[in-house]
From Swiss-Prot:
Record organism: Saccharopolyspora erythraea (strain ATCC 11635 / DSM 40517 / JCM 4748 / NBRC 13426 / NCIMB 8594 / NRRL 2338)
Chief place where the protein resides: cytoplasm
Gene that this polypeptide is encoded by: coaX
UniProt family annotation: Belongs to the type III pantothenate kinase family.
Binding site for substrate: G112, A113, D114, R115, T189
Annotated InterPro entries: ATPase_NBD, Type_III_PanK
Function description: Catalyzes the phosphorylation of pantothenate (Pan), the first step in CoA biosynthesis.
Cofactor note: A monovalent cation. Ammonium or potassium.
Cofactors that this protein relies on: NH4(+); K(+)
Family annotation (Pfam families): Pan_kinase (PF03309)
Presence of the UniProt keyword Transmembrane in the record: no
Protein name: Type III pantothenate kinase
Catalysed transformations (reactions): (R)-pantothenate + ATP = (R)-4'-phosphopantothenate + ADP + H(+)
Gene Ontology CC: one annotated term: cytoplasm
Any GO molecular function: metal ion binding
Length: 265
């Protein structure tokens, strides 16, 4: 089985894929787990958590594909893989690793591994231009050509970051649960915050996506498929007018695909 590991700033996501999909079929995600990222976690602590979640699957791993957007955990991730899965073929996505994704930006080394992997997965799923909206610590909106080229994108503060900042800077406001309010017009402080965060972010995303799609199609033609992913995507996607597909495991799929590119399938 293949273990996919996505170490992000807020969460670490694990995915377990079946060994060999049927010819022409997409890889089958058997299980997935999500846990809070601890930036000071050591390789041994990371391994203890990962192996604990995997349970009996831990000794059935035949391949590993991983990435980390947290520099302090990238080294610990490498150490963990070398120490606990010594003989298992593995790929850690970083500059120099073969992904097959052309990075048509000013400085390709600045592009995060998660954005590259999402590009690979989006192009695998759709033979059109794509825009990927990844709702994580930041909200990343990336443009991809129908040829699978990464063209760049836009960053915006993530939902939780914005909510934390608002609660810390406004004396009478506090952090609230991120759920859909009864109506857009809030009847109390909690609902007003929930409405502003949820519908405000949906509007922000739709505005950026429309501009990106217009620019993308003016230079690369159309059509364009818009994909939502990331931990907070389920909350916003249903309120978005532009996101047509919700793919929760987009990054995990990309990790599976990049493993196959480097080790064959």
């Amino acid at each position: 089985m293949l273990l996919a590991i996505d170490v992000g700033n807020t969460n670490i996501v694990l995915g377990l894929y079946a060994d060999e999909p049927a010819e022409g079929a997409d890889p089958v995600l058997v299980r997935d787990w999500r846990m809070r990222t601890e930036p000071r976690m050591t390789a041994d602590e990371l391994a203890l958590t990962v192996r604990g979640l995997l349970g009996s699957y831990a000794d059935r791993i035949t391949g590993i594909s991983a990435l980390s957007t947290v520099p302090s955990l990238l080294r610990e991730l490498r150490v963990m893989l070398g120490r606990y899965w010594t003989d298992v073929p593995r790929v850690v996505v970083e500059p120099g690793v073969r992904t097959g994704v052309p990075l048509l930006v000013d400085n390709p080394k600045e592009v995060g591994a998660d954005r590259v992997i999402n590009t690979l997965a989006a192009h695998h799923l759709h033979a059109t231009n794509c825009v990927v909206v990844d709702f994580g610590t930041s909200t990343n909106i990336d443009a991809i050509s129908a040829k699978g080229e990464f063209l760049g994108g836009a960053f915006a503060p993530g939902i939780e970051i914005s909510l934390d900042a608002l609660a810390s800077r406004a004396a009478q406001l506090r952090k609230v649960e991120l759920v859909r309010p009864r109506s857009v017009i809030g009847k109390n402080t909690v609902e007003c915050l929930q409405s502003g965060i949820l519908y405000g972010f949906a509007g922000q995303v739709d505005g950026l996506v429309r501009r990106i799609v217009a620019e993308l199609e003016s230079t690369h033609g159309g059509p364009t498929t818009v994909i939502g992913t990331g931990g907070l995507a389920p909350l916003v996607v249903t309120e978005s007018d532009t996101i047509s597909h919700h793919v929760p495991d987009l990054t995990l799929l990309g990790l599976r695909l990049v493993y196959d590119r480097n080790f064959g399938s």
